[in-house]
Design a protein with these regions (language model features):
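His/Asp/Glu-rich mid-to-C-terminal helical/loop segments that flank catalytic regions of hydrolases
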Residues: 67-124
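Metal-dependent peptidase/peptidase-like ectodomains
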Residues: 1-66, 72, 82
């Protein structure tokens, strides 16, 4: 689990998943159960989580898809306690559900379609 761009008031929660589609389904199920809206993008995600995905471990980044972050206008004024709290709740629910699962809900494998893309992304 990786977090990037958390705390923006404007925008929506996006779970960037580099892994099997079943990972996306499970994360959406957890988000729904937490009452926190999120969308999922099943793709190579430009984040620190790629180092895990590259080694075959399904990876996820929680991203707040909004405006102004990672730009010259990026200031603390763009952060929202409400948004940060919701991100923390969602991450906590995901960690709790997956960490306490009697049987882990998906395999530790990477879809073939991502393996070549990850090699290229990591300049291998």
């Amino acid at each position: 689990m990786n977090v990037d761009l958390a705390g923006q008031l404007i925008g929506g929660n996006v779970l960037g998943v580099t892994g099997e589609a079943s990972v996306c389904d499970k994360l959406l199920e957890i988000a729904d159960g937490a009452g926190i809206g999120a969308s999922v993008k099943n793709q190579i995600w430009g984040s620190d989580s790629n180092s895990f995905a590259w080694k075959g471990i399904p990876a996820m980044t929680l991203n707040r898809d909004g405006f102004g972050m990672h730009t010259r206008y990026d200031t603390i004024d763009l952060l929202s306690a409400w948004s940060l709290e919701r991100s923390a709740i969602l991450l906590g629910c995901i960690a709790d559900e997956l960490g306490n699962a009697e049987v882990f809900p998906f395999e530790r494998k990477m879809p073939e379609k991502f393996i070549g893309e990850l090699d290229e992304y990591m300049c291998r």
